[in-house]
């Protein structure tokens, strides 16, 4: 991983799904929506003063959201923070930094 650069897109792992699940309540509060389906499809990561995860989430038939989650370094107090999101995405929309 190059510090500051985004990795190539990779299929979501169990760990990435767990990260997505942990910030789901933050996203639902910001979008004023409830997501019955919330499946991580793929992700990219970026090393900063911690790690940014860009995760493509499927929320229904051909409905996708891109989320950005910051995971702080182990010695810092907060662990996972939803720092951005993009709605109205499709399966083919590429994950990009935002």
Curated annotation (Swiss-Prot):
Swiss-Prot/TrEMBL site (Reactive site) positions: 4
Record-listed N-acetylmethionine modification sites: 1
Gene Ontology CC entries for this record: cytosol
Subcellular location: Cytoplasm
InterPro entries: Cystatin_dom, Cystatin_sf, Prot_inh_cystat_CS, Prot_inh_stefin
Pfam annotation, one family: Cystatin
Keyword set, alphabetical order: Acetylation, Cytoplasm, Protease inhibitor, Thiol protease inhibitor
Motif Secondary area of contact positions after renumbering to this chain: 46-50
Keyword ATP-binding: no
Top-level taxon in the UniProt lineage: Eukaryota
Keyword Acetylation among record annotations: yes
Regions crossing the membrane: none
GO molecular function: cysteine-type endopeptidase inhibitor activity
Family that this chain belongs to: Belongs to the cystatin family.
Function comment: This is an intracellular thiol proteinase inhibitor.
Name of the protein in question: Cystatin-A
Provenance organism: Bos taurus (Bovine)
Gene transcribed to yield this protein: CSTA
């Amino acid at each position: 991983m190059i510090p500051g650069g985004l990795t190539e897109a990779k299929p979501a792992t169990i760990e990435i799904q767990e990260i997505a699940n942990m910030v789901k309540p933050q996203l639902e509060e910001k979008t004023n929506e409830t997501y019955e389906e919330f499946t991580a499809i793929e992700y990219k990561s970026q090393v900063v003063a911690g790690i940014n995860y860009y995760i493509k989430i499927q929320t229904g038939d051909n409905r996708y959201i891109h989320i950005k989650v910051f995971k702080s370094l182990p010695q810092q107090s907060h662990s996972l923070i939803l720092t951005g999101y993009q709605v109205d995405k499709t399966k083919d929309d590429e994950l990009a930094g935002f």
